[in-house]
Amino acid sequence: MPNTARFITPVDDPGSAPVLFRRVRPDRGHGAITSARLTVSARGVVEAWIDGEPVSPDVLTPGWTSYEFRIRTVTHDVTRLVGDDVVVALVIGNGWYRGHLGWMGNSALYGDELAGWAELRIVFEDGHEQVVGTDDSWSATGSGILEDDLYDGQTIDARLRPDLAALTDGEPVRVVDVDPALLVESEGPAIRRQELRRPEKIWQAPSGATLVDFGQNFVGWVKVRVQGPAGSTVTVRYAEVLEHEELATRPLRNAKATDRFVLSGGVDEFEPTFTFHGFRYAEVTGWPEGSPLSEDDITGVVVHNDLRRIGHFRSSNELLNQLHANVVWGLRGNFLGVPTDCPQRDERLGWTGDLAVFVPTATFLYDTKDFLSEWLRDLALEQAHLGGTVPVIVPDPLKGVDIGFPPLDATAIWGDAAVWVPWALWEAYGDVAVLSRQFDSMTAHGRRIRDLLSPSGVWDAGFQFGDWLDPTAPPEEPWNSKADNGVVATACAYRTAGMIAGAARALGRQDEAVEFDTMAASLRSAFTREYVEPDGRIHSDAPTAYALAIAFGLLDGTARQQAGDRLTEIMAASGHHISTGFAGTPFITEALSSTGHVADAYRLLLQTECPSWLYPVTMGATTVWERWDSMLPDGSINPGEMTSFNHYALGAVADWIHSVVGGLSPLEPGYARVLIAPMPGGDLTSAETTLDSPHGRISVSWRLDGGDLVVHADLPSEVEGLVRLPGRDDVVVPGGSHVFTAPMSNLVLG
């Protein structure tokens, strides 16, 4: 039966969060109800209720898509809620559709008119089906939500909240003209509350405000239980860090990150579910006198897409364990709606470059297949809209907005997300369908790169982000890196062409495989000719240049070893401090360890002085920072405009932690065949890595025992392992439990 529901909106816009409702009486004479399903959508975000009960635990439904091209619908089984006579209510928030988006202060970039859509299908025991959809017979009323914005927060007046089970009269609605072909069923996991956190500390700041520390930087909101004078307001502000003993809001830039709760005079419970904040600390003002805020009054609510954790790592080094935990929390906070760069300031956008470098880590830690596959649909649609150029933000709400960059064509890393992300999904989960669906997008990006190459065969023209946020770059010039942009872009283009050729072979597309193998070979030759000196040095002599050339396979034999040796010299000269940005950081430890410099890779990984991965850990970080020095050693905040304390890109090193420190990596897509090759180093005496692969749980653990390295491996029955230990011949093992030893004399410990 075709749907007849239409998008509707109040005739008179209330300004914020209208309730759209209708009373539904099931048809008589058809026996008992056997099933009832409610499908909802919105231009905005929607919470659906039946007789005052939420239909699901989902929040911020239906998430964020490229609204010009598709709008998600979400279906819920509501059989238990549909009785003789019920009120179906939709509360509509601004969300990503009408709220603020981007750092330029813009709002309503998709449109200034909220709209809700719903279809209730009731099936009776005689087979009769009753369908009730949104149309102009519905009504509208207020919700008690006076303001709602993802960046700025939410204001709720408890005195104005309606009883959603008792709605009768309301204001008229009108139908909004939306092409029904835009509606698509959601494929990915919903956004949901994941965890409740009690405060670890509540105290008074010098300003007199009450501060709450939840002990972890996370994303979501607080819910509050309070009783006070009617009309009085409790205000909650949020931030990731403190500075000068007060809430540090400067890094939020223009995001107000403020929730306000207007009290009714009775016992009120508030939960601002039409916004989200990135925070560890909350500042509370206006709390009723005579009853100080306690741990029972305020709760942190962790919110993100409902992803299943599949990968774990733990070692004997607690600082390294905390770094890994920080990477996990960074993913949790930024996989909300779409994979974002940061969750707290006036940005929170789907920057493609951040995900491109982080995706191997993401696919190991969580089952991200459906979440990222759906995001890739929007990438392909946005790319097609631009004639083959991959935008740097997906979804891209900033079309036509001056964002301070020149008009962008294809860019290395950021544009490469069109290829690197589906490739990583295939490697992690073994489902070739994602390659098939994204193949046109992948090849379009590769061909656009080819069109932009210079006559010399390298990619050295046009705007590039380069090694973004190189720690030696000035705070206000994050693009000003040591590594030459042409070196970075050409190396990435080679990697991209090789992946497209590999995807073509996996799909049986021989013509495209030859096309992109040829492109890769040409890029490799041009890279060597234009950028590699006779003594093995690479143009710009920067760590990122060597890391990419080695990790991407641009060098062979002597040249490769020369590059690894030179990289080691540079790292030693820097005191083994990290000196790479977005481009080089994910690959520098791999470049060192794969050229025989495992000890130097560990010295880099375990460095605690700034800049380093562990410096933020020593400063109390519980997520990965945007900058190596987002907080300076004296506790002050980096003066740069971009200073996020929850930015997962630099946490991409976790991929190397899993594969080299932990010793587990795939040899075939979906971990059908795996490499077991831990390389101990530093002060580590043990480590354990586990993965719930498509074939079952894989576990690799090792410990130093006397004079031996002892490795335990557990493989599912259908998974084959290749065991590679220092000083030992490779061994192929079937599924099952295995123990191996190697003399410690074969190890080079850092």
Where are each of the predicted segments found?
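C-terminal capping/lid segments that line or modulate ligand- or cofactor-binding pockets
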Residues: 88, 155-157, 346-352, 357, ...
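Helix-terminus loop motifs that line ligand-binding clefts
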Residues: 57-68, 244-256, 369-475, 612-635
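Extracellular/oxidizing-compartment recognition motifs
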Residues: 1-345, 353, 370-373, 387-395, ...
